[in-house]
């Protein structure tokens, strides 16, 4: 029940009261908790350092339809997009061609619904498939909007992820750009990155830095985008207000994300702008899965080279937190990845 409004603030205030002489830093790992922190920021500030934006800015950038309006203002490209509502679901159509992406506009509400064939993101290749997916979603408890987008051509390696930390002074302190090699393909994991190599694009980083500073952002920001080979532009999908699981690729490359926020809010250590450039491979899947399902080419060759050089990290493996029981669990987890990729690879329909 911690994710319920009437429980959330009292529970956190109680935690703070148990540490009266300590400065506490409040961070969220999920969308629902990040939003709760932001909505209750003024009540929490007397008890915690709260490195998050205000609610008014959150409302402008979290819903995808609002985010794309801001993209227009700042010159960011984004996929052709249409909005399907519960009210217009039976007549809904869009003015772009198949295949299309179908995903929930409200990720928190979607997370809490259930229906047969549920996936984090769907790909529909024709009208019949589109209608079946929309019907299945709206027969569940989810009644919020659906974002319908053109499918940007290219495999997982065309994706990019950009992580940033913006200090309490409103200035960007750290930016890192990652090139995913492979995503997860299980129903609940579609779109979550499974292997990333750091890359660098100064023009893109400069553009995003100006955007974050100009809108008054602070705290962690995480952008998902895809390179469109048709016009040579990055198409922005969304901004997340917190780090994701794969954000450890930044720390693995030598720039500890948690150190940035701790130095800024807890220790008041001045920080200069850093663009991460060092190459490193982060992965959460076994190497066998990466090289079986990753697309052969320069990026996969680079992964092989980084592994050979020892520049590779799977953050589940930590020598200070290891035991026979944990080893068994991680081994089973790896075996499960082989099973999941065999079963679900490139299956993004309703079946």
Locate the predicted segments by residue.
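Phosphate-binding site of ATP-dependent enzymes
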Residues: 124-184, 199-200, 206, 227, ...
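Glycine-rich phosphate/pyrophosphate-binding beta-alpha loops
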Residues: 181-193, 240-254
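Active-site nucleotide/adenylate-binding loops and adjacent lid/helix of ATP-dependent enzymes
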Residues: 16, 58-146, 168-169, 203
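A short, GP-enriched loop/loop-strand-helix hinge that lies immediately N-terminal to
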Residues: 19-62, 77-80
